């Protein structure tokens, strides 16, 4: 975990549909930081969308790209980074995030994920089979990783995105990870 607000990096982790990008973008505004969605960055660099990368390179190829992008993003000062839901499955990503920034886990129920992810279009891991079963399986596998990595755990199930972002900002300030800034 970083202790310098001059070098603040916030990594948003959590399952798909937890609000990492939406809350992260708002949080970046509150903290006067840049915002980057790692999946969008991967797509921009690759010139293809995530489902195509999964189809052509498989999850292993995608995770390799993800690790490279996260490694570069972790060198930027004052940035909020929304990671993909599976970024935590790779040991090197977990180590990178814990050593270079503050890790915020947005906790959300599978029921909320189902509502927020809609048909699952554009989400390769939901493309086949029963969506609820897949989400429950992913949660079972990843929840211990999210919990173990997180510096802050914030419920994103009921609140609106701005309220969740404000709660994160207040928790960061309470833990002396940044000054409390009025917006």
Show the residue positions of the predicted features.
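Hydrophobic positions on the alpha1 helix immediately C-terminal to the Walker A/P-loop
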Residues: 23
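A glycine- and Lys/Arg-enriched "phosphate-lid" helix/loop adjacent to the NTP-binding pocket
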Residues: 99-144
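NTP-dependent small-molecule kinase module
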Residues: 1-5, 26, 30, 76, ...
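ATP-dependent small-molecule kinase phosphotransfer cores
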Residues: 37-98, 123, 136, 145
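Conserved lysine of the Walker
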Residues: 20
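Short glycine-rich anion-binding loops that position phosphate/pyrophosphate groups of nucleotides
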Residues: 85-87, 109-111, 159-160
């Amino acid at each position: 975990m970083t202790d310098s607000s001059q070098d603040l990096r916030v990594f948003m982790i959590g399952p798909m549909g937890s609000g990492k990008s939406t809350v992260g973008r708002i949080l970046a505004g509150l903290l006067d930081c840049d915002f980057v969605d790692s999946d969008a960055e991967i797509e921009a660099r690759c010139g293809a969308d995530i489902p195509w990368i999964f189809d052509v390179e498989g999850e292993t190829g995608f995770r390799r790209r993800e690790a490279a992008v996260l490694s570069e993003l972790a060198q930027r000062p004052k940035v909020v980074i929304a990671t993909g839901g599976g970024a935590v499955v790779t040991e090197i990503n977990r180590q990178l995030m814990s050593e270079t920034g503050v890790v915020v886990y947005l906790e959300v129920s599978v029921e909320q994920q189902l509502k927020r992810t809609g048909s699952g279009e554009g989400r390769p891991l939901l493309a086949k089979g029963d969506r609820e079963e897949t989400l429950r399986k992913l949660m079972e596998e990843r929840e211990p990783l999210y919990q173990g990595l997180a510096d802050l755990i914030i419920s994103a199930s009921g609140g609106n995105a701005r309220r969740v972002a404000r709660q994160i900002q207040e928790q960061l300030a309470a833990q002396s990870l940044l000054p409390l800034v009025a917006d």
